[in-house]
Amino acid sequence: MDTRKVKSSSRDAVNCLPDEILAKILSYLPTKRAVSTSLISKRWRNLFALMIQLFESQHHLYLDDSDLVYPEEGKGEMKDVQESFGDFVDKTLTDCNTIKKLSILCPLKCCAHKDIDQWLHHAMERGVVDLDMRFKMGFTPTQNEWPCNVFTIKTLVKLTFRIEVGQNKMPYCPKGVLPVLKSLFLHAIWFACERLCHSMLPGCPILEELFLHDLRGYRYNDSPNFSISHKTLKRLTVHFNNSFELGRPMQFDTPSLLYLEYSGFAPCRYSRTSYLNSLVEVKLDVHIRHECNTHMHLSPIIDWIGNVKTLSLSPASVKMMYSRCVELHVFSNLVKLYFESNEKEGWEVLPRLLNKSPKLETLVLKGLHCASDHGVCVDRNEVKVLEIYGFSGCGREVRQVKCLLREMQFLQVMKVEIDAHDDNKKLRVINHLLDLPKRPSKFHIQFL
């Protein structure tokens, strides 16, 4: 059959569909693609508006400034493009009767305060439940220019918010009134940490998940404490950008916390961690700055991980443990350990951790090629599942695997991710692993 006839038949079949069916199809497309269909023909020009009318509660409105092509030169043209994007967002939101999920991303160019305020007003009026807004303002907003409306949308269940204001700090932290908010994600927010705890979090009475990424705040002398206090919080993620000169005192009052992920410098010795016994899983990426080491202390870190069932340690965390000769407590509840090190000294921490983890069942390793030539000796343990990532098949890796298999008498499965781009090399590594000394019949190897 002629190719042109097939294409023509396909177009005719689509065009024969009722407008309501086509609008339903558009509701499954990303907003940018759904809007672009208006260029197909006169009939398609109004289908996006029909989709908004019929399926607005099901569609995720995703609007970003890459929807428009930026001219390479000419400030006048750029201003026109920015205004055009603002008009497009404003018209799209105005055409909606209700909005459940909305994302507006303007990472490339600065947004005007009046536009942001208008978009938030539209979202608030239409009962938005899930809001994701990320933009830059190009200046430090005053209290009147800061988009406070975002923290007063009472229908919000999930809020993701990022604002870039250059190298200046936010002069204050707005009070939140978010009675049904359960998940709060803040990116690159520049205000003092204690103001977050005292001004914003009290307005989120049922908050369960708090994510603070690239948290900067004030310098050590201006804002000495990092404090999180919340009774219903279950998941907490804190990613500092390591801009602080010194370790900071940290205080946690989170009796319901189950998951903690922390990335940044080690806290100072005056930190107080209350109510962390409920923790089930902890991920640590803890750094230490040697010129400031008198201010940083590891006892708070050990307190965090004392009762967890799942623990993840980054190379920086492992380095911190061996460089400071940390005395480890018994991890009486630990059943799964993620361990990664890119230095041979770091692998000396692994036997100590295994000896302190009597209930450990799953061990996940990465960076095995950095272990010493003679391998790391471990005592017999209860591990049943061993996972190895980035295995290239070098001699020291193979020797280390043999050592682990010899002491893991209860091991049932070993999962290995082969790091080889060449298929022939990958096959050689697989055959090498399969030729290792035979184990009991219950043991088997899986390749990831």
UniProtKB/Swiss-Prot annotation:
Query: Any idea which UniProt keywords this protein has?
Result: Leucine-rich repeat, Repeat
PROSITE patterns, per database record? FBOX
Q: Does the keyword DNA repair apply?
A: no
User: Matching InterPro entries, A to Z?
Assistant: F-box-like_dom_sf, F-box_AtFBL13-like, F-box_dom, FBD, FBL60-like, LRR_dom_sf, LRR_FXL15/At3g58940/PEG3-like
Question: In the UniProt record, which is one GO cellular component term?
Answer: vacuole
State one Pfam family annotation: F-box
Instruction: Give the LRR repeat ranges.
Output: 82-106, 185-214, 215-240, 310-341, 342-367
Domain F-box intervals:
11-58
The identity of this protein, by name, is: Putative F-box/LRR-repeat protein At5g25860
From the record, give the cysteines joined by S-S bonds.
none
Does the keyword section mention Repeat? Answer: yes
